[in-house]
Amino acid sequence: MQDFLEFQSISKGYPGVQALSEVSFSVRKGAVHGLMGENGAGKSTLIRVLSGDQAADTGEIRINGEPQHYRSVRDAFNAGVIVIHQELQLVPELTVAENLWLGRFPGKAGVIDRRQLIRVVSDRLAEIGIDVDPEAKVASLSIGERQMVEIAKAVMTDARVIALDEPTSSLSSRESEILFALIDRLRSNGTVILYVSHRLDEIFRLCNSLTVLRDGRLAAHHPDISKVGREQIIAEMVGREISNIWGWRARTLGAARLTVERVSGANLPQPISFTVRAGEILGFFGLIGAGRSEMARLVYGADRRRQGKVLVDGLAVPADSPRLSIRAGVVLCPEDRKFDGIVQGRSIEENMAISSRRHFSPFGVVDKGKEAELAERFIAKLRVRTPSRHQDIVNLSGGNQQKVILGRWLSEEGVKVLLIDEPTRGIDVGAKSEIYEILYELAAQGMAIVVISSELPEVMGIADRILVMCEGRIAAEIDRSDFDEHRILAAALPDASATTATLPEQVS
């Protein structure tokens, strides 16, 4: 089958960084083409060039043999190119239907026919297999539901080329299966799919071919993915072999550091209880909607508690106040780091120092020298890849943004408990191992760590103990010596947890 999408010698640089250098590869019509690489390898830059969001310094993109000269995202859209970014492009205050039909509403003489709009959108969503209320405000949807709306928007435009950037990072298993079925349908219709993911299982399941980028250059191009193995791809991504990505090792655990006693809230009505020992990494696993993130927000004080107590080293942590939780030694790295974790438009230095400024801001005046010293120290310690501490944090890869958030809390004096939600979502295999090493180092220093993840291999790989959540309650407690994938998944499923789970003693 003929080449339909071609990248020819694409180069793109920013001040202090060469993001892409002479990248060339092609994709056949009707193919699903994987794009992999470590964070910072150049994948997102290449996608931005394809989408018309940014222009390449040199090189050319061809679609069906025709050179493309985009000046804007609109130009790319008109050429049949749609990119679904990790940072969703929906308008929160508009409804699902309005977002899906934005700019092309049905009606006459400028008057929108809303009944026709709802009818058309309902029919198309049902046809695609997406169960979302077309009249619901996007702001009211979960992250996974918003992702499905974004995907539906691309499918409903009859695009010739669709690029998906980590599309399943916020999806449940059921939603992912719907997406995979859509991709198969688009493939059969001749649409080119550029599939950016760090999940090798998805790459091997969906893709016909694969390109690997490393440090802005073409590391490998595989026209037939069936002829390449996982270990080879990982080595091509990181430039070295990673024999054990998890790197777990036993540690000496201390006394109970974090104690949660019958805590509940509006979004987690059933009271839950658990303890985490000093030096322990406790994993929380469950399906989307199981209540994992809600638990973390209650413990941290971001959501209001209805009842219960949180104690650190036996001392009560005041309820409903992140500020007081931080002072008590409890910190949270949130699930959605783009919106809840980083301060967009601010530098790495400012993001790292934001929680510690009171320590070097006498009389309300920030000591910029101490702030710079702190940033440089943690950039080096956490191996943040950046040309300067002054760089805008939005220009960092996901893995480096996560390191900056960790650096923010490590710079805070007296942190005893770290709650980290989806620690490696959208992060490449090399950066994942670096994040895990940071967590192991913190645990070895006596910190109690709670890791919340929807990736079962991750939880099983790094946790000393796992609590499985199902429908807002703790359904099972499993020690590392008893880890079993089938048992954990069975406990996470609503129809199975009641008969297969072993409840922890702490739960009343």
Swiss-Prot record:
Residues that coordinate or bind ATP: G37, E38, N39, G40, A41, G42, K43, S44
Family the entry assigns: Belongs to the ABC transporter superfamily. Arabinose importer (TC 3.A.1.2.2) family.
Classification via PROSITE patterns: ABC_TRANSPORTER_1 (PS00211), ABC_TRANSPORTER_2 (PS50893), ARAG (PS51268)
Physiological role: Part of the ABC transporter complex AraFGH involved in arabinose import. Responsible for energy coupling to the transport system.
GO cellular component assignments: plasma membrane
Main location class: membrane
Highest taxon in the source lineage: Bacteria
Gene: araG
Location of the protein in the cell: Cell inner membrane
Its membrane topology: Peripheral membrane protein
GO molecular function terms attached to this record: ABC-type L-arabinose transporter activity; ATP binding; ATP hydrolysis activity
EC numbers on record: 7.5.2.12
Protein name: Arabinose import ATP-binding protein AraG
Domain ABC transporter: 5-240, 250-496
Keywords from the UniProt entry: ATP-binding, Cell inner membrane, Cell membrane, Membrane, Nucleotide-binding, Plasmid, Repeat, Sugar transport, Translocase, Transport
Catalytic activity of the protein: L-arabinose(out) + ATP + H2O = L-arabinose(in) + ADP + phosphate + H(+)
InterPro entries referenced in this protein's UniProt entry, alphabetically: AAA+_ATPase (IPR003593), ABC_carbohydrate_import_ATPase (IPR050107), ABC_transporter-like_ATP-bd (IPR003439), ABC_transporter-like_CS (IPR017871), P-loop_NTPase (IPR027417)
Subunit organization: The complex is composed of two ATP-binding proteins (AraG), two transmembrane proteins (AraH) and a solute-binding protein (AraF).
